[in-house]
Amino acid sequence: MRLSSGGTTANMSTKLSSRKEKGKRLERLIAQRINDVLGGYGVTAKRMIMSGAIAGWKGDVFVDGLPVSIEAKNQEKINIWECWDQAESQAGLGKMAVLVFSRNFNKDPLTVIRFEDLLTLFELAIQAGWVSHIRKGRRTIL
């Protein structure tokens, strides 16, 4: 059976599956990196199946110990504003919306947060005494 896009249903199914696998791969990477860096502080992360719909959690990665909601996108082309709207709506009240995206793993993933949240993180870093480490060029913050 041919579809209007010129592909067969089997090809379309394979492409959809491939896209989902790329998304899952980024979600697993995010969770693993959070666990590697913050696990010693009692923070744990795990990829949520079906974006957490089953557990009542919204977001792609659940982080226990931090008030964040992470939306992950691993796509060649991305509509930042559309993805950001999704991240914010899933975060709800009391959680920092975080959008992590990658261009099919061609580059390191990038992260989008609200500017006010960035200022809050800077303020917390200063209060915790991490600023001297930043000035020395050491990467000790998240």
Where are these regions (language model features)?
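Catalytic phosphate/metal-binding cores of nucleic-acid and nucleotide-processing enzymes, i.e., regions
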Residues: 1-142
